[in-house]
Amino acid sequence: MKNNLKYTRNIGIAAHIDAGKTTTTERILFYTGINHKIGEVHDGTATMDWMEQEQERGITITSAATKCEWLYNNNIYKINIIDTPGHVDFTVEVERSLRVLDGMVALFSAVDGVEPQSETVWRQADKYKVPRIGFVNKMDRQGADFFNVCEQIKSNLGANCLILQIPIGIEDNFQGVVDIISKKAIIWDEKNYGTSYNIRTIPEELLELTNKYRNILIETISEYDYDIMGKYFSNPNEISENDIISSIKKSTINLDIVPIICGSSFKNKGVQVMLDAICRYLPSPIDIKETKGINPKTEKEEIRKHNSKEPFSALAFKIATDSFVGRLAFFRVYSGQLKSGTYILNSRSGNKERISRIYQMHANKQNPVNIIEAGDIGAAVGFKDIKTGDTLCDENYPIIYENISFPDPVIGLAIEPKYKSDIDKMSLALSKLSEEDPTFIVRNDKYTGQTIISGMGELHLEIILDRMEREFKVKVNKGNPQVEYKEALTNSIEHREIYKKQTGGRGKYADILFKLEPGKKGAQGLEFINKVKGGNIPKEYIPSIEKAFKEAMKNGPLYGYEINNARIILIDGSYHSVDSDQLSFELASKIGFKNAAKKTNPIILEPIMKLEVLTPPENMGNIVGDINRRRGIIQGMEENRSNSKIIKALVPLSELFGYVTILRTLSSGRATSTMEFYKYKPKPAPYNILNKK
């Protein structure tokens, strides 16, 4: 059966940890008939949290995809859902999911409001221009305040909130919502897991508030819709429900507004209305219309329209290792269709790959399908060479889509196999795990020869080591966590490197003149500009020179830390018709970079974390003093509805190892903290080198 893309939705559910993402997804699966029993996070039965570590810890670690159908307005909508982690250590899962999704449901706790990871997820959605709706969850909890959370979304996230519902009751008395558009009350039946609800007239005590927010709603959408504006000023009664719904959808897709609704997923209230809102307001693939890419042959921009008649194109956004089927590549199809058993082109590698099997995923279960079409999300096996961010396409119509960018790891750990006989098994495990997770990096320390694994936080690496033991049967000894510093250039230098070697017979010769300078602010990697003229360096050697410079950036001139932002202008050079070859120019580039970098007054960069502490007022002084002693900079202090203090600060990661234990001591166990990576900043002198020689 062919897709009707008008009725397809590709959405993600994202939020801070413990806001109720997985609980919400489990309710969606129940109400749409995928599951016949509600899975719960707290008892380890959630379908989407299928990893043993997720079930044991009660948190989501990896993004999980599924598919369901929902009847809305007499049409069956197909909804592809990706449930994402809320812990900052696993933000890579959110990043790569949002890259391929058309819409997002952002969950907020009605008690805790906008939390640190809420802000991170919001920035990621802004980066990829993902339309979203907000769902204020946990309306049944003590301290729930729907309107306060809406204000936080406005002030902290800069969102133009459009309130579509008013809660009926609060905390233990939360019963349902008033739909502002239809001016009806929706009350859920608690006896049958919320599968049925009643439509009633609005309670009299909420009529005035409903009219107030309905006027605000119409005024807001009229700012972006001239038809609504005209009716609003001439005769507001002419504005129909369909007019309002259509206008809200248009403004949501244009990122002008964020519709806000509310409920309690755990108490089975509000989820069906959220599914209606997904169908009503979030875009279908044809609402997005097209995706732009680059033709690798012509290097010109090309467009793929989102329909099955276009040439096939897709983006691989996740690689996973499955014990039964092997390497599994998740991908979003933007155009055309793919049949199992056919060949496609990997634009990065230039290789043709045969797709042996295609699956629709339901958490960790694979449902085989023969064909997958534009607008769908699926997975496939058969790839010999596949990486996250690869574009897959019809070999006759090559295209490269924008890749997925990931944050750099900030924490490292030295490991070795517990038993020498396991060294090969450890290497295999590390290779497969780093293939899955672009923020998990494996390297050998050039000073000590140790294997260093790097990731986004202590929990991230803890999960990696746990998976090595469970899935690959490898036990390791580990050192203490260490900060992943970086090096940076501060000055420009023009440098000439001549590599010459004579050993009798054919020798080696390469001559390059280049300018090395700091990269543009906010950029990553190497910006390479070739200005060589007149064939002084044969053009076939230029790619090798660029590749060698990139390789050289992995080892900075001070202590061997990576330089991740530089600009190189290749100015001139010379070659020998007999002695010059690709290797000669690669060696000249690597040696030249190292020699030039030493003269740019390089500095050390350290990772800075955004720290947020929630504490009783009486412990605030001790905690602020301790943060100051850790080279922290206080960014602000707030008070929440329970009169607890929220301390926000920027603190170097090197000062935060073991901070949870320290905080517990300072507050007698009453304070809690969260942290997330902020940015790399110059480390002030003196720089103490730990575990370096």
Swiss-Prot record:
Q: One cellular component GO annotation, for this chain's record?
A: cytoplasm
The GO molecular function terms of this record are: GTP binding; GTPase activity; translation elongation factor activity
Q: Name the major location.
A: cytoplasm
Q: Which PROSITE patterns match?
A: G_TR_1, G_TR_2
Q: Does the keyword Cytoplasm apply?
A: yes
Which residues does the record give as GTP binding sites?
15-22, 83-87, 137-140
SMART domains cross-referenced by the UniProt entry: EFG_C, EFG_IV
Q: Which BP terms from GO are recorded?
A: ribosome disassembly
* Parts of the chain that traverse the membrane: none
- Function text: Catalyzes the GTP-dependent ribosomal translocation step during translation elongation. During this step, the ribosome changes from the pre-translocational (PRE) to the post-translocational (POST) state as the newly formed A-site-bound peptidyl-tRNA and P-site-bound deacylated tRNA move to the P and E sites, respectively. Catalyzes the coordinated movement of the two tRNA molecules, the mRNA and conformational changes in the ribosome.
Write down what this protein is called: Elongation factor G
Provide the organism lineage as a comma list: Bacteria, Pseudomonadati, Bacteroidota, Flavobacteriia, Flavobacteriales
